[in-house]
Amino acid sequence: MNMFISKEEWLDKNKRKSDMENSLLERTYTTLMGNVYDKDGYRWSPYRCITPGKGSFTGIWNWDTAFHSIGVSRWDTDLAKDGILGFTQFQDEKGKFPDIIWENGNIEGHYAKPPLFSKACEIVYRRDGDREFLKKMYPRLVANENHWRENRCRSGMFFYDSEDKGEEIYQLHVRYESGWDNSVRWDKTITDMWPIDLNCFAVMDYRSLTYIANELNLCDDAKMWAEKGVELADLINERLWDGKNGYYADANKLTGEISDVLTPASFMPLYINIAGKEQALSMA
């Protein structure tokens, strides 16, 4: 099952009032489609996958793939599903999705990225209703949640890590898992932190797993995921909200101290709609 419309149809359907906006839409389309790999000759073949940038960031990348699939699903859901299926087939025995599959076939699997594939699958499915795609992906998504819960969780909340502890490059790899490679957030040791964005992404993950389980008539699973999402949202508001200063931020998972470093990540609880009215007004 595929939802496909041509470039011209998509641009006409989404036509804006200004030339600048229309130019940006066309640039979006041509950039994504210009970075699609051919079906053959790669480790992920026969799936058609998208790279962040041919010649600059070769290979296929974890959450880049999720974002690419969300984007192209607006005009070609088969291509969106190819990207997701092509990348997630490299899931390891613990359930972790790697960070990168390079063009030459090598895999960077010590670390991952925040869990976004459930949300990507939900969005793609809402556009074409392909239940077989959901059936194929659901076990992979469940295994990935298990990886985060078993290997990246302390006292009910998630943290970033890498599988190469003891190596000189370990702390840098943990930063890579966050996607905020050189952020001042990590001037304090990243492995000591409960990151605000990661835990909000995990709430999104639970919500999408709830939706997918319901679509597959897995009622007990759906109930479990929904409960996990509510529990985590409550912990975010309990542990990552600084009531004295009126903001959300990362917190030290060993001491409970909330960081004084404010970044756009602090707005994630508002984005996923778990902040109360008082918190939202304070952050405005």
Predicted features, each with a name:
Residues R43-F57, K136-F158, G276-A284:
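Long hydrophobic alpha-helices with heptad-repeat/coiled-coil character
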Residues N14-E122, R126, R131-K135, V142, ...:
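Substrate-binding groove/exosite segments of carbohydrate-active enzymes
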Residues M3, Y37, I50-S56, L141, ...:
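Intrinsically disordered, low-complexity regions enriched in Ser/Pro/Gly/Gln/His and often acidic
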Residues N2-S6, G41-P46, F57-W61, E93-D99, ...:
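Short amphipathic alpha-helical segments, especially helix-boundary/capping motifs
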Residues N2-E9, K15, D19-Y29, K39, ...:
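Catalytic cores of carbohydrate-active enzymes
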Residues G86-Q91, V230-E231, A284:
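Active/binding-pocket-proximal capping segment
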Residues K94, P98-L116, E122, R131, ...:
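The feature captures the catalytic groove of carbohydrate-active enzymes
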